[in-house]
Amino acid sequence: MKKSKSKYLTLAGLVLGTGVLLSACGNSSTASKTYNYVYSSDPSSLNYLAENRAATSDIVANLVDGLLENDQYGNIIPSLAEDWTVSQDGLTYTYKLRKDAKWFTSEGEEYAPVTAQDFVTGLQYAADKKSEALYLVQDSVAGLDDYITGKTSDFSTVGVKALDDQTVQYTLVKPELYWNSKTLATILFPVNADFLKSKGDDFGKADPSSILYNGPFLMKALVSKSAIEYKKNPNYWDAKNVFVDDVKLTYYDGSDQESLERNFTAGAYTTARLFPNSSSYEGIKEKYKNNIIYSMQNSTSYFFNFNLDRKSYNYTSKTSDIEKKSTQEAVLNKNFRQAINFAFDRTSYGAQSEGKEGATKILRNLVVPPNFVSIKGKDFGEVVASKMVNYGKEWQGINFADGQDPYYNPEKAKAKFAEAKKELEAKGVQFPIHLDKTVEVTDKVGIQGVSSIKQSIESVLGSDNVVIDIQQLTSDEFDSSGYFAQTAAQKDYDLYHGGWGPDYQDPSTYLDIFNTNSGGFLQNLGLEPGEANDKAKAVGLDVYTQMLEEANKEQDPAKRYEKYADIQAWLIDSSLVLPSVSRGGTPSLRRTVPFAAAYGLTGTKGVESYKYLKVQDKIVTTDEYAKAREKWLKEKEESNKKAQEELAKHVK
């Protein structure tokens, strides 16, 4: 059985929506060397080889380097690997390591050189520890599945080899055009064997001294619900591209939205996420009328999903077993789920965090971003839309582009609910159906968002038919019932809102997360990966998994993406997940230089990284940002084209 935890994200990350995510702009006056802002989720550990949650990987991206990284245009460029080659058959990738890369302790003391064996050690450790990210590599690296499943105990049979101190080689099961993008995931990062042995079970615990550093920064402080601090690694192999000396992040629980702007105005923060619905926003808007920037939407998608097999009821408004049973029957009914989908007013939901002006700027309507890949000159989203005609007239003419709501339709919602109610009453279901949705009690935007959903669904379908019960929890209760719950049975809700950032450049990175055998998001649906469940079969996830397996066999990019468009269309029609918003698309103020930071659609070396980021004294203007964005987009197109052409040089 292959089981994984997802590199999924909580709503808290969405609410902040800034940090270096904008890669925003300004003039060239770069006096400051410190980046100050906030963070919203403590990491459970720093074990980048075993963990796969964003709370960990976003930190480690700044502390540990892998083979490759992203530049400011999203190209994959050398990092610890100076160069690489791939065999003609696409099965063997060989990386030549730089000789000046070193490991350092958290105090900055040199520990050892980085060698090819460190990458072998890293993957073996990840396999032995049953890493949450094994789904990324288990079926990719030759022999790894046999080692993980116990068919062999000899790791030397696995397709990762240290040919010498400076050469590491991976042999794949089948060609993967996107393999290099996988090397940006922390499961393929190196680790020093001697240090690993010396730490034992303490390796990677939530303490700066628990790991070694070969990246741009050293962690100087990690205090739960208080602060995270980094200092530039002066001996880093690429120190010339690290322009910030100190990074200081202060814990933010969402209870005092105005504090972000206050600290920015006082000079304590480098950036500030703005909340258009806050009581002080009109004053802020007048004060900073020439400085408010809306960031671009990025590749992280958020969506609601139903718990198909709920076992825990610690946080519920249900008072009887018949209410619990009725809800379980309802969420298994496709017409009911579609009714909820069409009754969900996403524009109103977006307005709770972005105000009326920016309400649609964050909306995303597919799990796979509509422009993530193209198929014969058409965006992925366009092709998915063309597939929807196969699923009924309710989907005709739908547009899945970002930044608008194609779903909200009270007439469709009522029609679907009428069908659902007839089917459910025949099974003895009692109405209204109660759906529990948890939210942190300190998360003002989250509470406003859930309240908006409650209002739109109950007003369209009637509170005598459906009731959204808002469960306001403490931070620890919220985490333990959702994001940090260890099993599907511990997931304590009927509706969940989470996000997924892509691990590699292929639609499967999003759609595989619901695979019944290994899906990284499956537990959030109340299902355990690899375990038979009649609820999964009842909603068609067995068919969905078969479609994934067939698509994964296809190596021709156009044909492959076409198959994944079919799968995305199936998922939309099923309404098992309800796409909502993306990261980005949010208003902020900042003092960072124009599009200097790394940019990436996948992995951990893009928006998460402070390498390349430049801080300045002057506040960025809206006009400066617009001009810089236009310039960057043009340069990006040219740079990406050149990088694509140069790939052929690596085939040997």
UniProtKB/Swiss-Prot annotation:
Give the main localization category: membrane
Q: What are the protein's UniProt keywords?
A: Cell membrane, Lipoprotein, Membrane, Palmitate, Peptide transport, Protein transport, Signal, Transport
Q: Its GO biological process terms?
A: peptide transport; protein transport
Question: According to the Swiss-Prot or TrEMBL entry, at which residues is a lipid covalently attached (S-diacylglycerol cysteine)?
Answer: C25
- MF terms in GO: peptide transmembrane transporter activity
> In the UniProt record, which is one GO cellular component term?
periplasmic space
PROSITE patterns from the UniProt entry: PROKAR_LIPOPROTEIN (PS51257), SBP_BACTERIAL_5 (PS01040)
Where is the protein found, in the record's own terms? Cell membrane
Report the protein's function.
Answer: Part of the binding-protein-dependent transport system for oligopeptides; probably an oligopeptide binding protein.
Q: Can you name this protein?
A: Oligopeptide-binding protein AliB
